[in-house]
UniProtKB/Swiss-Prot annotation:
Protein keywords: Ribonucleoprotein, Ribosomal protein, RNA-binding, rRNA-binding, tRNA-binding
A GO term from the CC aspect: cytosolic large ribosomal subunit
Source organism superkingdom: Bacteria
Function: Binds 23S rRNA and is also seen to make contacts with the A and possibly P site tRNAs.
Gene Ontology MF: a single term: tRNA binding
Organism: Agrobacterium fabrum (strain C58 / ATCC 33970) (Agrobacterium tumefaciens (strain C58))
Listed name of the protein: Large ribosomal subunit protein uL16
GO BP, one annotated term: translation
InterPro entries: Ribosomal_uL16, Ribosomal_uL16_bact-type, Ribosomal_uL16_CS, Ribosomal_uL16_dom, Ribosomal_uL16_sf
Protein family according to the UniProt entry: Belongs to the universal ribosomal protein uL16 family.
Lineage: Bacteria, Pseudomonadati, Pseudomonadota, Alphaproteobacteria, Hyphomicrobiales
Subunit structure: Part of the 50S ribosomal subunit.
Amino acid sequence: MLQPKRTKYRKQFKGRIKGVAKGGFDLAFGEFGLKSQEPNRVNAREIEAARRAITRYMKRAGRVWIRVFPDVPVTAKPTEVRMGKGKGSVEYWACKVKPGRMMFEIDGVTEEIAREALRLGAAKLSVKTRFVQRIAE
């Protein structure tokens, strides 16, 4: 699963996801893409599950680009532990995804295969997404 090799600080504030994506909203690498429609935190497990679903359906033909990286540590306290006594330990890593963010891109396959592969990948993610395609000029 994806996670940073090293970070400046172990824990982070929760924060809020406001506004729309300022960058990373266009197709940069592939012919087809999966674009987020709503703000949410997507964890590393979801990203990995989506990647596996996409590559499995494509039967390893073509190429997949993951355009999001889980760089936010999410902490949790153990169950049945009283409040206080400091912040919990890091449970998993997540990525704050804004609306309009390109999450996955694929190339080297037909539109039908790309559409179905990204539909299967989207089912693993906790955000609403849509299929996008490069416009031929």
